[in-house]
Curated annotation (Swiss-Prot):
The lineage of its organism: Bacteria, Pseudomonadati, Pseudomonadota, Gammaproteobacteria, Chromatiales. This is Phosphoribosyl-ATP pyrophosphatase. Pathway: Amino-acid biosynthesis; L-histidine biosynthesis; L-histidine from 5-phospho-alpha-D-ribose 1-diphosphate: step 2/9. It comes from Nitrosococcus oceani (strain ATCC 19707 / BCRC 17464 / JCM 30415 / NCIMB 11848 / C-107). Coiled coil: none annotated. One of its GO terms (molecular function) is ATP binding.
Length: 104
């Protein structure tokens, strides 16, 4: 797994025990799944708007926010990024149509 993702996943796990007054991530965890999902949705919209602008810096910045909040959602759900990477690896080499057909 990418070292940055691994380090970030470890940090996000540690933040589950942090003081919400001193940690943004701990604050999100304390607020609960609905707050995390709302934030994830906001970041998805901001990423779409950045892509529409075709401004590379904005796209990168907003995608980083989207990925970060996706990792928070995974951690809150008791999942790790390597599980998502394993799923991507499983799909690698499958056509999109074949993968969709495999889902039933």
């Amino acid at each position: 797994m990418n070292n940055t993702l691994e380090r970030l996943a470890t940090l996000l796990e540690e933040r589950k025990n942090a003081d919400p007054q001193h940690s943004y991530v701990a604050h999100l965890y304390q607020a609960g799944q609905d707050k995390i999902l709302k934030k994830l949705g906001e970041e998805a919209i901001e990423t779409i708007l950045a892509a529409k602008s075709r401004e590379s810096d904005a796209i990168i910045y907003e995608t980083a926010d989207l990925w970060f909040h996706s990792l928070v959602m995974l951690a809150e759900s008791g999942l790790r990024p390597e599980q998502v990477l394993s799923e991507l690896e499983r799909r690698f080499g499958l056509s999109g149509l074949e993968e969709k057909a495999n889902r039933g």
